[in-house]
Each structure stands twice: as C-alpha cells, then as structure tokens.
C-alpha cells in the first residue's frame, strides 16, 4: 500500500486500466487503492519499483527495488515498451515459481513516472536534434557570488553547455564547483542539479553534501573499485538522458574527467595499443561519450555538463587525457595555480577562459560591453593584476549590469 499511497488519482486510474480492472466513473482515490490492492491480493502479486539494468542478451533486472530484491524482466517486455538501462520502472510483480530464484515482472505499469503510451512513442536521445546553447544560466544573482558573476562576464554558461574546468592542483576546484552548484540551485528552478564525484576523498564528498543544499550528489570514492566508478557514471548519464527525452533540464557537475578516464583505462580490456603515458586509446572513448552527451535539444530539454580536468599534476597520462579533451568542450574555464598562491579566489584566468558562440547567450549591448571589459583587462601587466581588479570591481557593484555601466572607471578605483 505504500506505493499506492504515493500515487495520484490519474496514476491509479492508468494502473487499473493496465491491470484490466473494471472501475466505475468518478471513483475516488481511496476506493481505487482498495480495488487495486484487492486485485493484487487475488493474483498473489504486489507492486514494486526499481531501476532497470539490462544484460547483453536482452533481459534485465530491476535493482534498488522497493522489495529489497532484484526483480527479473523478460527481453520481450523490455523490447515492447522500449525500455533502457536506467529506466525507473513500476510493475506488478509475482513471486518465484518452481526453481526460479528471482521475483519477476508480470506487468509493466509505468516507467519514469510516464504512462506506457508515452514510453512507446519516446524518441531516443541520440536521435534528438542538438543546437547551440541559447538560454543562459545566470549565476551571479547575488552580489557576493564572485565566482558566478565572473563566469557570467567571462565564460557564460547556457543550457546544454559542455564546459571544461581546467584545474591544476590546489587551485580551489572543489570550492569552485560548490559555488557553481549553489548558484545554479538558487537561480535555475527549472533545472535539476547533480554532482558526480569520481575517485574523490570521502571527506570532500561529505563537505560538498553539507555545503550544497538542493543538489543530488553521487559519489564513488578513491577506495572504491574502479568498476564502481564506471557503474555509477553510466547509471547517472542514462538517467540524465531519459529526463532530457522527457523535455527536462539537467546539469551534471563532474569532478573529474581525468579520474574517470583513468578508471576506464584500468577496467577496459587492452587493445594492444598504448598512447604516451600508458593510456589505452579505447579507454578514452567512454569518457568522451559521457562528455559529448551534453547538448541543448531543439524544442526540448537540455543536458549541461560542467566537468573538471586535471593539468600540471606531473603525470604524463593526465597530460595526454587533457590533450584529448581540450577541444571537445564549447566553454573553457581555466583555474590558475599562480592566482591561488597569491590567495586570489576564485582563481580564474580571465585572459584564457571563454565560451564559444557566447553571442547566442547574450544580447547585443551585453556583448559590446563585455568585449570592452576584456580589452580593458588585457591592458593590465599580468593576470594577477587583471583578476584582482575585476574582483575588486565586482565587490564594489551590486550586479554585473552596474559594473558594465561604470566601465572603465570601476576598474581603476
């Protein structure tokens, strides 16, 4: 009854229809719950909810279920309803018969909170039409959000952006990711924010969970098996794609692409070829597939991925991974070790950071003012002076519109 209690009246009506239960016109929610419950009892079945995991042979299992057990799903059911790995499935479930070991789905009732007709008509993610981002995430809503305001000026991020945060060690990337996540949650109520932490320290996972309220945090820490890093990542990207297929907007902040590529390099079977640094070329395919999934869908939803990638670690492998990814994003945000050593935070290198096709995210007046700002910042002797001047200007103005209106005076106060 717990599942029935959480369902809306229209959901109960749809379930009754799929279960071939005759119901009268205008029946109330409590009556429908009782009728469905009686039908389940007569059939010796029950309702269960879980996440579909498919096998190469075509069949699958619902995992992380409300029953606490894996539930078998036949290949014919998966094919009929065009179900895929990661789908959240609600079904009528029967107990094992004879020598069977698992509970099994008798009927599929709903998936991803949609009715069955919507499932059968959905367009696969890969067939949706990608376009350049045209709707900006405004991150600098609050005066004190320096990171968000700098990004809005220097590297604006839009729905469907594929952004790389190029980060050397000790440049404050974890704090930077937290500030972006908080800004997204504060200003973008129509987008889900997910944080994916791969091969991170457990205490950093705890820190982000405590400091970012409203985001869903997924993590596989450095003491987990690399196979778990991959499992978590692949489940997350499939869930995100399904939400975008339904017209929703999802933002994934990944820390980091480098460690994800390292995990694939350990787990993937060797191709017999090695790039410089000891990385197998085939190990880069899956992380690229993950990062490349970010896109803005024409007349639909969007998947935005903001991912860190490590540089200047002293590892040749990390250098090769960066070289493979550096031309794949459409927004580059460079963090700088020198700025961090001078205790200038956020340590964003404003001379190197930028967004491709930023004119699609900003209006004509904003573009002209921001390009003027860039020219003024380039007049400084070095990036330390330029970044310090911009941060000071941000602190003395209420918002970016006010800052741009006071150029060039505000930079030389």
From Swiss-Prot:
InterPro entries: AAA+_ATPase, ATPase_F1/V1/A1_a/bsu_nucl-bd, CSD, NA-bd_OB-fold, P-loop_NTPase, Rho_factor_ATP-bd, Rho_RNA-bd, Term_rho
Keyword ATP-binding: yes
EC numbers for this chain: 3.6.4.-
PROSITE patterns: RHO_RNA_BD
Keywords: ATP-binding, Helicase, Hydrolase, Nucleotide-binding, RNA-binding, Transcription, Transcription regulation, Transcription termination
Top-level division of the source organism's lineage: Bacteria
Residues annotated as domain Rho RNA-BD: 45-115
Gene Ontology biological process: DNA-templated transcription termination
Spans through the membrane: none
Pfam families reported for this sequence: ATP-synt_ab, Rho_RNA_bind
Binding positions (ATP): 158-163, 170-175, 201
One function term, GO molecular function aspect: RNA binding
NCBIfam families: PRK09376.1 (NF006886)
Subunit-level organization: Homohexamer. The homohexamer assembles into an open ring structure.
Biological role: Facilitates transcription termination by a mechanism that involves Rho binding to the nascent RNA, activation of Rho's RNA-dependent ATPase activity, and release of the mRNA from the DNA template.
Family to which this protein belongs: Belongs to the Rho family.
Name used for this protein in its record: Transcription termination factor Rho
Organism listed in the record: Fusobacterium nucleatum subsp. nucleatum (strain ATCC 25586 / DSM 15643 / BCRC 10681 / CIP 101130 / JCM 8532 / KCTC 2640 / LMG 13131 / VPI 4355)
Gene this chain is encoded by: rho
């Amino acid at each position: 009854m717990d599942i029935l209690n959480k369902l809306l009246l229209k959901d109960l009506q749809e379930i009754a229809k799929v279960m071939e239960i005759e119901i009268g016109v205008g029946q109330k929610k409590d009556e429908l719950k009782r009728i469905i419950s009686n039908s389940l009892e007569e059939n010796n079945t029950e309702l269960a909810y879980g996440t579909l995991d498919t096998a190469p042979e075509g069949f699958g299992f619902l995992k992380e279920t409300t029953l606490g057990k894996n539930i078998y799903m036949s290949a014919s059911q998966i094919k009929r309803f065009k179900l895929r790995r990661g789908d959240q499935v609600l079904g009528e479930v029967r107990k094992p018969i004879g020598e069977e070991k698992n509970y099994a789905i008798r009927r599929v009732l709903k998936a991803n909170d949609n009715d069955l007709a919507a499932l059968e008509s959905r367009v696969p993610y890969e067939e949706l039409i990608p376009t350049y981002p045209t709707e900006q995430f405004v991150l600098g809503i609050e005066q004190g959000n320096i990171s968000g305001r700098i990004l809005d000026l220097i590297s604006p991020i839009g729905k469907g952006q594929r952004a790389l945060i190029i980060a050397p060690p000790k440049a404050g990337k974890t704090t930077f990711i937290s500030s972006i996540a908080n800004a997204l949650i504060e200003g973008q109520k129509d987008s889900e924010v997910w944080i994916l932490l791969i091969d991170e320290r457990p205490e950093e996972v705890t820190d982000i969970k405590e400091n970012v309220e409203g985001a869903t945090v997924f993590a596989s820490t450095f003491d987990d098996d690399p196979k778990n890093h991959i499992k978590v990542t692949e489940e997350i990207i499939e869930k995100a794609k399904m939400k975008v297929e339904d017209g929703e907007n999802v933002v994934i902040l990944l820390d980091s692409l480098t460690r994800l590529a390292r995990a694939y390099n350990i787990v993937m079977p060797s191709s017999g070829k090695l790039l410089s640094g000891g990385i197998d070329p085939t190990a880069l395919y899956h992380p690229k597939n993950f990062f490349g999934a970010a896109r803005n869908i024409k007349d639909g939803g969007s998947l935005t991925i903001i991912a860190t990638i490590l540089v200047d670690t002293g590892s040749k492998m990390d250098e090769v991974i960066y070289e493979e990814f550096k031309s794949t994003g459409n927004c580059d945000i460079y963090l700088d070790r020198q700025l961090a050593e001078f205790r200038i935070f956020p340590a964003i290198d404003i001379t190197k950071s930028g967004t491709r096709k930023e004119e699609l995210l900003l209006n004509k007046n904003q573009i002209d003012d921001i390009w003027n700002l860039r020219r003024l910042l380039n007049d400084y002797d070095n990036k330390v002076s330029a970044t310090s001047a911009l941060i000071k200007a941000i602190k003395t103005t209420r918002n970016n519109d006010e800052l741009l209106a006071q150029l060039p005076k505000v930079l030389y106060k």
